[in-house]
C-alpha cells in the first residue's frame, strides 16, 4: 500500500479575439510522492515556526486546444507539454491552513453565497406566508358566505 495526496484543478475557457476563438481545456495536478507508510508522509511535512511546508510535484495536462472552428491543436499541445513535472516547496500554512485566509474565505462565502441565499429564502417565505394569509382570508370569506346562504335557505 502506498500513500500520497493529489489535488487537481480543471479549467475550461474560451478566448474570443477579433477574428478568432480559442477553446482551451487543461488541468493542473499538485501531488506528493508515493510514501510506503504514513510515517514517511508525515516526515515529508516540515514545520518551521508556524509554517508547514512540503514538496509538491506539479503536472499540467492539456485536454483540448482548438483554434477557430476546426483547427484542432490538441495533439500538438499535448506533445509540447508532454509528461513534464516541476517541483516546488509549498507553504501549506499560508496557502491552505492560514486562519486569516480561512476566516476571509468564510466571510466572503457568507457575503456572496449565504447572505443572498438567506435573503432570497426569507423573501420567498414572506411571499408564501402572504399568499397563505390571502388564501385563508378567502376561505374564511367563503365559509361565511356559505353559512349565510344556509341560513337564508332555512
From Swiss-Prot:
Belongs to the MG032/MG096/MG288 family. This is Uncharacterized protein MPN_512.
Amino acid at each position: 500500500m502506498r500513500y500520497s495526496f493529489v489535488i487537481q484543478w480543471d479549467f475550461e475557457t474560451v478566448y474570443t479575439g477579433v477574428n478568432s476563438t480559442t477553446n482551451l481545456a487543461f488541468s493542473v495536478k499538485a501531488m506528493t510522492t508515493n510514501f510506503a507508510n504514513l510515517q514517511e508522509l508525515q516526515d515529508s511535512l516540515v514545520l518551521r515556526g508556524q509554517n508547514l511546508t512540503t514538496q509538491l510535484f506539479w503536472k499540467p495536462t492539456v485536454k483540448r486546444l482548438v483554434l477557430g472552428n476546426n483547427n484542432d491543436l490538441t495533439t500538438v499541445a499535448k506533445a509540447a507539454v508532454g509528461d513534464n513535472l516541476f517541483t516546488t516547496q509549498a507553504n501549506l500554512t499560508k496557502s491552505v491552513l492560514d486562519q486569516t485566509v480561512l476566516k476571509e474565505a468564510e466571510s466572503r462565502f457568507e457575503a456572496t453565497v449565504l447572505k443572498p441565499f438567506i435573503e432570497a429564502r426569507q423573501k420567498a417565505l414572506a411571499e408564501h406566508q402572504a399568499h397563505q394569509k390571502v388564501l385563508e382570508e378567502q376561505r374564511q370569506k367563503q365559509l361565511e358566505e356559505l353559512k349565510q346562504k344556509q341560513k337564508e335557505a332555512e
